[in-house]
Amino acid sequence: MNMRPLNKILAGAILITCCWMNLANATLINRGNGMIYDSVQNITWLQNANLSGTKMNWEDSLAWADSLSVGSFDDWRLSNPDPICGLAVYNCTVNELGHLFYNEFGLTQGQGVSSLFSGTNANFNLFINVQASVYWSGAEYAPLTASAWYFNTKTGIQSAGNKQKGLYYGWAVRDGDVVAVPAFRSLAIFGLGLLGLAACKRQGRQRAKLGAV
């Protein structure tokens, strides 16, 4: 029996599945329309890290993020800090922007994003207008409610600043992805299983015929 058609179908299904899974395993995915999905944190970043074009105090920055409508989504916010990590501390990777800084951009303590401006860092180059400066987080600093958390992309430090006097940048995010998770992955794996089972059965029948000769 000619197995070539089945083998071609099987090879094609494997190739398609591998391509999809490589995309699914990517940490940062450009979803288009100015949005970058972070599959590890399950949040979507604005591609433009300075969409407002100006520094703002904390309350204005909150209001700016809340008023955004990008890609038909209007549930934007400022990034979350990591209060447990502490004040004036490096390597706070539970901080959403800290995770991006250390884990996705691969930067280290005291190393700023300016070191990536002219480089070939693929993750960093997904974004535009990233400032080597201070970005507000979306939460107050509980021990001193006149202050709010921020993250400094010039040094990688998490700290807090006065909500009214501090003029920093805002970088908006939203929870979750901006596209529906496709069912193709499950269907492809199921299809591969069926193709593999069919191939095994055909090979078994061929061996049985040969053994009967």
Predicted regions and their residues:
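Sec/Tat signal peptide C-region and signal peptidase I cleavage site
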Residues: W20-A26
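A short, hydrophobic C-terminal helix/tail in secreted or cell-surface proteins
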Residues: P182-K201
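C-terminal membrane-anchoring or membrane-association module
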Residues: A198-V213
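Bacterial N-terminal signal peptides that target proteins for export
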Residues: N2-A11
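Extracellular adhesion/carbohydrate-recognition regions
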Residues: T27-R77, L167-V173
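Short, structured beta-strand segments at or near domain termini in extracellular proteins/domains
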Residues: N162-A180
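Bacterial N-terminal signal peptides
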Residues: A11-C19
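An exposed tryptophan-centered "aromatic clamp" motif
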Residues: L62, D66-F73, P81-Y150
